[in-house]
């Protein structure tokens, strides 16, 4: 490319994926990730001067556009300046104010088949600690984001178990295999499980004589969130002082 002729992307997303603040969770999450995809792709190119997303706010339009209500839902905020999830993608790229948002309310009843699918953290913090029913599960950082060209890209939550399976007193190999399978069920559901998880299941059956009854029990106890005490999640955004290495929680989501 000719570096003497600046190249600027003047519009992306917008009418290609209209999103309302009251759309279902998967739609709002996809909207946010589409914005992150473009920002990450542009940041990876040295010969692109920048990009402008369409657009900041929803707006009134003519009778032939919008959702039959003469409103274009193209913004990362609604027309009253209330942020959609996609706004967090941009808010994360500054460091003046702490940001911590999740792509999910963590309510299984919001999703088809009670499968949450992939859940992302949006933050500009140095670390995010995840707790389930006050039990520590995992700590995430910006380095865990698949959006490697963004300073603060969305972070995929890949563990809902932590060390909780130690209560089952399994052998190390069995515990690792069960944890891998349960976390995969959380992300993909049964219908979209990767083939490698089927192989893991067969290995658990042959090596440790596990059966379907045991698998269902473990799923209901550690993943299913059905009945019993309500499952609560807590996420803490943590900033680290560069000079003293002291850590402080700057924002919490429950």
Listing of model-derived features with the role each one plays in the protein:
Residues 122-127:
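Short proline/glycine-enriched turn/loop motifs at strand-loop junctions of beta-rich domains
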Residues 195-232:
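Intrinsically disordered, low-complexity acidic Ser/Thr-rich regulatory segments
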Residues 166-180, 187, 224, 228-243:
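Short, aromatic- and glycine-rich surface loops/edge beta-strands on solvent-exposed regions
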Residues 137-150:
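Solvent-exposed serine/threonine-rich low-complexity stretches and specific carbohydrate-binding patches
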Residues 243-254:
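Edge beta-strands of extracellular beta-sandwich domains
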Residues 148-168, 221-224:
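Exposed aromatic-hydrophobic patches
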Residues 1-82, 86-119, 134, 143-144:
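Substrate-binding/catalytic cleft of secreted carbohydrate-active enzymes
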């Amino acid at each position: 490319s000719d570096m003497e002729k600046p190249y600027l992307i003047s519009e992306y997303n917008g009418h290609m994926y209209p999103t309302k603040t009251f759309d279902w969770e998967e739609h709002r999450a996809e909207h946010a990730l589409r914005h992150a995809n473009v920002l990450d792709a542009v940041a990876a190119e040295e010969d692109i001067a920048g990009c402008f997303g369409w657009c900041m706010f929803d707006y009134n339009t003519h009778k032939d556009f919008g959702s039959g209500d003469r409103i274009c839902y193209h913004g990362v905020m609604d027309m009253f300046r209330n942020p959609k999830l996609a706004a967090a993608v941009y808010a994360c790229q500054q460091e003046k104010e702490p940001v911590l948002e999740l792509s999910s309310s963590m309510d299984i009843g919001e999703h088809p088949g009670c499968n949450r699918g992939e859940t992302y953290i949006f933050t500009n913090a140095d670390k995010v600690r995840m707790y389930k029913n006050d039990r520590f599960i995992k700590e995430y950082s910006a380095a865990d984001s698949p959006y490697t060209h963004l300073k603060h890209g969305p972070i995929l939550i890949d563990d809902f178990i932590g060390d909780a399976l130690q209560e089952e007193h399994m052998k190390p190999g069995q515990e690792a295999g069960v944890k891998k399978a349960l976390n995969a069920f959380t992300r993909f559901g049964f219908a979209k499980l990767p083939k490698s998880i089927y192989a893991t299941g067969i290995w658990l059956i042959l090596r440790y004589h596990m059966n379907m009854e045991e698998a269902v029990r473990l799923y209901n106890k550690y993943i299913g969130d059905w009945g019993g005490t309500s499952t609560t999640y807590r996420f803490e955004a943590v900033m680290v002082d560069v000079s003293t290495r002291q850590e402080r929680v700057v924002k919490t989501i429950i």
